[in-house]
Amino acid sequence: MALSFSIYTIFSLVLSVIAWKIFYNRHLHPLSCYPGPFIWTVSRVPYAAYYAQGKLHRRVQLLHDQYGDVVRVAPDELSYRNQQAWKDIHGHSRNFPKDMRFYHISKNKAPSVLVAPDGVHRRQKRAILRAFSEPAQKSHECLLHPFVDTLIHKLQQKVEDNNSVVDITEWYNYVMFDFMALELFGESLGCLEDGVYHPWVDMLFGSIKAWAFLSQSKYFPTISWMIKIAGLLFYSDLLQHRTTKFDSIAARVPGDVESDLDQPTFTTYIKARNDPQSILSREEILSNHSFMMMAGSETTATLLSGCTFYILKHPEVHKELSCLIRNRFSSPLEITFSSLADISYLRAVLQEALRMYPPLPLGMPRVVPSGGAIVSGQFVPEKTSVAIASWATYQSSSNFKDPQSFLPERWLDMGPGDNDIKDAMQPFSVGPRACPGKMLAFAEASLILARLIWAFDLELSPQCSNWADQRAYIIWDKGPLLIKLKAPS
């Protein structure tokens, strides 16, 4: 009798605590004045569940359509989808630190430029910015051209062998991962030559879902051990493989500035010691190389994949772009960063592809600093997690006319997007932590896309007509994008 009474008492206390927590979160919490569905405002479980399933970006879009430009998506988190939020959260005059529950620290515990504290970030970014100077841009182009030549040659062989249907997503990844490996580690991964992913790249894509699952443990500290154990049970082989690959990367980071290559690389510029205020330790270089290997390759390959899909879904865009490129260039040797820079329609196509298929469709959360802050015209208390939902923002009719339509012309002067709020789209972020690789990413994507369109007529496989309807785990979980290649007509 005493035992059953004790169990009943404990059970009642637990229920009382849960009931009080629900009541507090809904009615007394500092964010209780912000709109959101009941279950999301009292518990983080719905957010975590949709995130782990890869469906968060679409669910948050629907919540914004229902509740407006700001939605409470968890007891302590707000989601935004307007232009002002970019300035208020990420602007130069702001000091909203990263929400470290969302991010990961490198295995060697040295923070990369993505997550480093402000002082460390400034020092690291000074070093990294050297790799994006105008002279550096020319070096990067010289290193990229041979990979693009190999890509075109390999695809031409496919056409000659009557094997003209290819998964272009894979080939874009081959190019970009090989290129970034050369830039960062001094040697290619050999993906293009072998026509298969290097084991390290395979591991990266295979671990997307594991990261999504395990990252949620930080949001549930009382049961984080259970989540981690479950993750180890389901993903133990993958996590061990990841550790092995990180160690192999560490062994490949060059120890000296000198390189056997004719052109300076990212590593050359980053390790140059002409500024004593921007010297990186070997551990910091390793962390940043690991980060940039993904950030500098997967995102550009994703942009190219999304752009190719939407071009081929819209024959009028494909025709216009093909005519522009083939009429302008009589030889592929003429297609360079500089010769493509003033083709405004090509830039507009890439911009619209970024809007329709942003490489990072989810928000990257920050934390409101001590004392609170005004975000999008409303006071937000300190310690609140805030993020701009990229997918929801770019697909909102309050920011873009006909947001579900692929309209490159909206980015041209006097086009149908004159009344669009274009500053609501910031795929490279804004402020002191904005991605410094914006111009290089556009140049790389322009070059690869232009060379492909110059060399081939392209046709989308019917089975890929809904290719962009994908799940997202920080990045997209892309399926095969099958296209048919033909010699240009």
Where are these regions (language model features)?
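Cytochrome P450 heme-thiolate monooxygenase catalytic core
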Residues: 97-107, 139-302, 320
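Cytochrome P450 I-helix active-site segment
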Residues: 39, 141, 145, 196-206, ...
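Cytochrome P450 heme-binding "Cys pocket" and the immediately downstream C-terminal segment
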Residues: 315-318, 438-475
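C-terminal helix/juxtamembrane-tail motif
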Residues: 1-5, 474-489
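Conserved cytochrome P450 K-helix/beta-meander segment immediately N-terminal to the heme-binding cysteine loop
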Residues: 388-416
